[in-house]
Amino acid sequence: MKLAVYGKGGIGKSTTSCNISVALARRGKKVLQIGCDPKHDSTFTLTGFLIPTIIDTLQAKDYHYEDVWPEDVIYKGYGGVDCVEAGGPPAGAGCGGYVVGETVKLLKELNAFDEYDVILFDVLGDVVCGGFAAPLNYADYCLIVTDNGFDALFAANRIAASVREKARTHPLRLAGLIGNRTNKRDLIEKYVEAVPMPILEVLPLIEDIRVSRVKGKTLFEMAESDPSLNDVCDYYLNIADQILARPEGVVPKDVPDRDLFALLSDFYLNPQGSERSLAAV
């Protein structure tokens, strides 16, 4: 099974991805997490350091794939999760999609791409150009991380449009939304009313989630010394269980940006009195 995790920049995708990866490993699955961001910090909370990227390794070996070994690019993270960072082209040059393609090519050359029960792509920000939408070409499911904010949901709609486009050519489905660090969900529910899709989980505004990123640890690792965090880990285990059940998922509805902008902004500004629907926009 292959998963692609997207969401607005800074929404907590990498923290969420790392904890989902550990949760899947706790369920007995062999998991590989692939960071698809030039910052190459996707797997930081799994490994505790910034691991070398595949692009760095290939450049050091003059792109001689035959000289690269699995241990050169695959690092063991917390909970037995294997970690890879694709890296990226120099700032202002090149294409991130090319980097993702080279990463998958190398892992296939190493016979590693098919050795895992679950491969999770953690993809940079809310960029949904053809390049950074590339992981959707390999994914069975897309997961979108959001919060209860207007901007994050607007970004989610753009990502949903990419899923819809990719689903034309292969059996990709949107597994659903994950609300991250939010005590409210009214705007999320308004969005899902307009664009029907599952809400896999909504994690409350828990400071330890943010702190875990700074510490370079997953919530599961932190829970070893602070058992009160086991309740937080249960959120990620619930997400893992839903994914492993191979949900039907959805091909998202086509909602024009302007219509959704009007709907969400109206509800955001007037949450009590708004009865507006997309049909009225």
From Swiss-Prot:
Sorted alphabetically, which keywords does the UniProt record give? 4Fe-4S, ATP-binding, Chlorophyll biosynthesis, Iron, Iron-sulfur, Magnesium, Metal-binding, Nucleotide-binding, Oxidoreductase, Photosynthesis
Q: How is the cofactor bound?
A: Binds 1 [4Fe-4S] cluster per dimer.
Enzyme's top EC category = oxidoreductase
Catalysed reaction(s) here are: chlorophyllide a + oxidized 2[4Fe-4S]-[ferredoxin] + 2 ADP + 2 phosphate = protochlorophyllide a + reduced 2[4Fe-4S]-[ferredoxin] + 2 ATP + 2 H2O
Q: In which pathway does it act?
A: Porphyrin-containing compound metabolism; chlorophyll biosynthesis (light-independent)
EC numbers:
1.3.7.7
Gene Ontology terms for molecular function: 4 iron, 4 sulfur cluster binding; ATP binding; metal ion binding; oxidoreductase activity, acting on iron-sulfur proteins as donors; oxidoreductase activity, acting on the CH-CH group of donors, iron-sulfur protein as acceptor
Q: Which PANTHER family match?
A: LIGHT-INDEPENDENT PROTOCHLOROPHYLLIDE REDUCTASE IRON-SULFUR ATP-BINDING PROTEIN (PTHR42864:SF2)
Function comment: Component of the dark-operative protochlorophyllide reductase (DPOR) that uses Mg-ATP and reduced ferredoxin to reduce ring D of protochlorophyllide (Pchlide) to form chlorophyllide a (Chlide). This reaction is light-independent. The L component serves as a unique electron donor to the NB-component of the complex, and binds Mg-ATP.
Q: What does the record note on quaternary structure? A: Homodimer. Protochlorophyllide reductase is composed of three subunits; ChlL, ChlN and ChlB.
Q: Supply the name of the protein.
A: Light-independent protochlorophyllide reductase iron-sulfur ATP-binding protein
- Organism of origin: Thermosynechococcus vestitus (strain NIES-2133 / IAM M-273 / BP-1)
